[in-house]
Structure formats: C-alpha cells, structure tokens
Amino acid sequence: MARSDVLVSTDWAESNLKAPKTVFVEVDEDTSAYDTGHIEGAVKLDWKTDLQDPIRRDFVDAQQFSKLLSERGIANDDTVILYGGNNNWFAAYAYWYFKLYGHQDVKLLDGGRKKWELDARPLSAEKVERPQTSYTAKEPDNSIRAFRDEVIAAIGTKNLVDVRSPDEFSGKILAPAHLPQEQSQRPGHIPGAINVPWSKAANEDGTFKSDEELAKLYAEAGLDGEKETIAYCRIGERSSHTWFVLQELLGHKNVKNYDGSWTEYGSLVGAPIELGS
C-alpha cells in the first residue's frame, strides 16, 4: 500500500480544506484541545464519550457508530482525514475504528496537530456544523482485532509487540507516568513480547519515519515478518498507532490490535506474566 493511500501531508491538507466529499476530523487525548482551536472545518470526535460504549467495556457498536457519524455529517463515500495531538496518538485509534467498521477512504494527516502547528498553519475557533447524513457502518472486521483468549494462545507462536514505555513493560509502573497508576491488578508484560515503544515510529515533528527506518526498527527488535502479529499497550490506543505502521505502512499481513491490552490482561486471573526487560 502506498503512503498516499493512508497519509496526507500538511501541504495537501491546507490545499484541500474545502474539497468536496472530504471531512477533517480531530481526535485528541486531551479532549478539550479541539475547543482551543482546530483546523478550519474539522469536526470533533471525543474518544471517551463518542467511541466508547457508556455501559459495558467495549466500543460503540455498528448502530451507535452509524448514528455518531451521521450526526457529525460524515457519509460513507467521504474521504475522512483524521488528525490529533501527540503524534496522532488517538487519531490512529480512530483510524482503526473506521477500518473496523468498514469505512473505505480514511487517512491520517502525517504529523497531526503537532506538525500543523509547527508549520504555523492557522487554527479556527468557529463552531463546525455539517448537514446530517445517513451513515451505515458495516459489521466489525474482527480480522484486525484481537481478544484475550487469542492473545494467550499466541504466546510463543505469534509476534507480540508491547508498545508501552520500557518502565511499563518491565513492571516498574502500570501506566504512563502522567496517568493514574491503578489501572490493572498486576504490572509486567505478556511472556515473549518484544518492546517497541509506539513513539519510536515518529520523527520529532510527529510525522512517520521512512519505511526503511520503520522496517529496521522492528526487525532489530526481533519481529518476525513471516508470523502473525498482535500489538498491545494499556487500553489499545498506542497499539493502534503501531498497528497502522505495521499493516498500513509496512504492509505486514495479519496484524491485530489487542484493545483490551494491559488493563484487561494485567487483571486476568491466572494469566502468565513476565517482569523485567
């Protein structure tokens, strides 16, 4: 898959802000960032309130996703350009959602909000309202989603890529240092997992490293390109960024994101765990 199939540059984005059938969507870890200024015409998706089921621990289902995108004015045949802060951390998470529910034309803004601001490009504070559509999501494509039993069965047979920080991987902490630390019952990592922090795939300006640099990064960490791969982190957002790199940029086959990640796995009774680096 060519990079142009899944990424757009900030130059392209600024030239296509008002292009027909093109919708810019901001998704941030800091859900208030959009309100301080956003790309002109972009709509907001809140990863906490829009993409998560309000009762059970799971994503919104196809019906809920259809309702959400219809209300945001996104149609099935629109080109969706996703972007956000922190090297597209949650924008990649949303990209994976869109692919899970079968949206055909979705891309990331390479570098996200960080690159846009480094370029000194304009932000808008205007409220964005688009005409409502009748979006219809497909049934979820679980070929890109891993569940806990599959993850346990993958130990010793598939690539397991832990994309958290070295301190999370080794068991020193349970979550990124700026977040609460009571997210799971036990620290550590899945036995046999390799540790490639998600952020190593990005340059200083938030853009993705070259395919050659990315391939070298994972090969040197011990990833076997002939095997199936499951990526995980704490709640599935950082690992969706790695899923994007491996499947969409490098073209690996059979790559899955384990969105239950460590907050599920680290609380399972009897699940094998390793500590240390």
From Swiss-Prot:
<comment type="function">
    <text>May be a sulfotransferase involved in the formation of thiosulfate.</text>
</comment>
<keyword id="KW-1017">Isopeptide bond</keyword>
<feature type="active site" description="Cysteine persulfide intermediate">
    <location>
        <position position="233"/>
    </location>
</feature>
<dbReference type="InterPro" id="IPR001763">
    <property type="entry name" value="Rhodanese-like_dom"/>
</dbReference>
<feature type="binding site">
    <location>
        <position position="238"/>
    </location>
    <ligand>
        <name>substrate</name>
    </ligand>
</feature>
<keyword id="KW-0832">Ubl conjugation</keyword>
<feature type="domain" description="Rhodanese 2">
    <location>
        <begin position="154"/>
        <end position="274"/>
    </location>
</feature>
<feature type="domain" description="Rhodanese 1">
    <location>
        <begin position="18"/>
        <end position="125"/>
    </location>
</feature>
<dbReference type="Pfam" id="PF00581">
    <property type="entry name" value="Rhodanese"/>
</dbReference>
<dbReference type="GO" id="GO:0004792">
    <property type="term" value="F:thiosulfate-cyanide sulfurtransferase activity"/>
</dbReference>
<dbReference type="InterPro" id="IPR051126">
    <property type="entry name" value="Thiosulfate_sulfurtransferase"/>
</dbReference>
<feature type="cross-link" description="Isoglutamyl lysine isopeptide (Lys-Gln) (interchain with Q-Cter in protein Pup)">
    <location>
        <position position="67"/>
    </location>
</feature>
<keyword id="KW-0808">Transferase</keyword>
<protein>
    <recommendedName>
        <fullName>Putative thiosulfate sulfurtransferase</fullName>
        <ecNumber>2.8.1.1</ecNumber>
    </recommendedName>
</protein>
<dbReference type="InterPro" id="IPR001307">
    <property type="entry name" value="Thiosulphate_STrfase_CS"/>
</dbReference>
<keyword id="KW-0677">Repeat</keyword>
<dbReference type="InterPro" id="IPR036873">
    <property type="entry name" value="Rhodanese-like_dom_sf"/>
</dbReference>
